[in-house]
Amino acid sequence: MKYLLVILFFFISSFQNNSEVIIDKKEAQDAFALLIDIRNNPDKYHEELNFEKGLKVSKIKLKWNDTLAKIAESKAYDMANRNYMGHVDPDGYGMNYYIKKSGFKLHPKWTTEKSANYFESLAANTYSGVESINVLVTDKDVPSLGHRKHLLGLDSWNAALTDIGIGFSKRESGSTYKTYTCVIIAKHDY
């Protein structure tokens, strides 16, 4: 009987481990490295990522920000854990709220609406952080190309952003998607 209980325990435990949310920092760093390379060499990627050659990408060097990375990791974890995909969490809060809550300085008017998001791009169900960046830069079926503009700094707002953090989470079961990626690009003391 004792052996049967042990076997039953391990059998049940094996299913529970598959629903654990895992933060993968290596995938986040790989995504960051690719984004930097795309921004530095856009013509190298224009065919693969479906944008015109000679695209005027922001020349501002993005700096990894540990605070933004922790927020991005928390968001990727939360989406996997609570099984949603969106810029506003189930409690109605957007990314600007969480950035301000972390101590990262934002203009006060950017946090008056609790669902506001000026700094976040999201991807889901990609096999890697690199694929997440590819999907977001391609921005297929997004007429405004908002993710591309955000990640590559293609307009005056996004071109001024300097700090970046990326979170990549995995969950084998228990959520709609197996992976969630959150990319935050902002500017400290804006």
Give, region by region, the residue ranges found by the protein language model.
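Sec-dependent N-terminal signal peptides
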Residues: Y3-S13
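Signal peptide cleavage region of secreted peptide precursors
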Residues: F15-S19
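Short, well-ordered surface patches within globular domains
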Residues: E20-L106, A160-D163, S169
